[in-house]
Amino acid sequence: MALATEWGLTAQNLEGYVGAVDLNDRETELHILGHLDVVDPGEGWTVTSAFEPKLVDGLLYGRGTDDDKGPVLAALMAMRAVKDLGFSLKKNVRLIAGTDEETGFRDIHWYYDRHPYAPHTISPDADFPIINIEKGHYQPTFRAAWPQEAALPRVSSFTGGPRLNMVPPKAQATVLGLTAEQVNAAIAALGMEAAISYTVAPAEGGVRIQASGQNAHGSTPEEGHNAQTALLTLLAALPLADCPSTQVIQNLVRLFPHGDHIGQALGMAQSDDLSGGLSLAFTMLTLTDTGCEGRFDSRTPLCGTDATVRLPAEAALQAAGFTVEGEIDPPHHVPATDPFLQTLACAYELYSGRESHCIAIGGGTYVHGIPGGVAFGASMPGFVSNLHGPDERVNVADLLTAAMIYTQVILDVCGE
């Protein structure tokens, strides 16, 4: 907000939920929605640490450079360019910078509960060209409970991923009644993929096991290596007592087998020509001596319905002894023939030199559910930003191109 004010724009902090930046005091025609919050730093950074930005060969490394502070800055630069170059506008553009995109959208919901939608909305929180389809979400919570256990050997605790929309890079479990030698023998016989590693350490009455993998965005689970499902796979291979926790672990391995990224085992796998296939990441699980709670993150295509997604998953989980809570958040779809999308396409083609087209993603942005809203940039096609992972980066030249594209969009939508 301070930078926007320094650049001669009108900026305000709206009760800590969002920052709003206006180009003028006329009726608002265009909203640009970005966010300033970031995910956890994670591990595995090699170029720099997560919160020490570093420019190397035209790439700016650091957490949030691509998701989404860099793109927000590109939009702000576009607003400054329109102002500094003296273009006459008949309408206003408002940049809305949120603070809760990664953990629930409470910020943007708060804003639109109090302010009207704009006739046109874009979010620079994804890729170019135009994302006109954002898949739906089915992210239920399931639970099971049982009396205090005493049987040995058993799993007495399990801690999986910390975030619903992130493939877990770490998972830990305590196993009572087994030795490190027994567990290491099971690891050797398991044949797990090379990207997964296990460490075993002595603990009171047993061992502590940690699985390490690679995090990824929950909408693209195939790009990560799920430590949570890898650890469950190992636990199910151990000589555990026949008790409730063991039965739960075996059921979880059956319902969420390591490497199943499409919900095949839950009976949810499906796809359509416009939006592609369903994705699923089993991302959160806690287990104690008396119960467990888990969540998974599935992104549903346009063809996904209660009958083809929720009901099969509920039936499978309930048959395994779990209670289930959760509903489908429907997909977001703006027809490719919408005139606003044609305006965006022209601006993109003019400055990128590439042909525009519409695409579907599993990720969700602030425009999800906003009438006519689409995600538009700021990453160019083919660029690997490693968002949510180590060595997140943004291409500075592409960011400047994005700023030019957004400048043109502002002129086309809000100009005289």
List PLM regions with ranges.
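Short beta-strand
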Residues: 10-14, 199-202, 282, 358-359
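A non-catalytic alpha/beta surface segment that caps or lines the substrate-entry region
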Residues: 1-28, 52-53
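Acidic-enriched catalytic cores of C-N bond-cleaving enzymes acting on peptides and small amides
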Residues: 132-159, 164-214, 218-280, 306-321
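Acidic/histidine-rich catalytic neighborhood of metal-dependent amide-processing enzymes
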Residues: 68-147, 180, 184, 188, ...
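An extended, acidic, His-containing surface patch that forms the Zn2+-binding/catalytic region
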Residues: 215, 219-289, 295, 299-310, ...
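Short coil/turn connectors at secondary-structure junctions
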Residues: 26-31, 49, 56-57, 89-93, ...
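A generic structural motif
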Residues: 19-21, 173, 205-212, 293-296, ...
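Active-site metal-coordination/substrate-binding segment of hydrolases
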Residues: 29-97, 103, 389-401
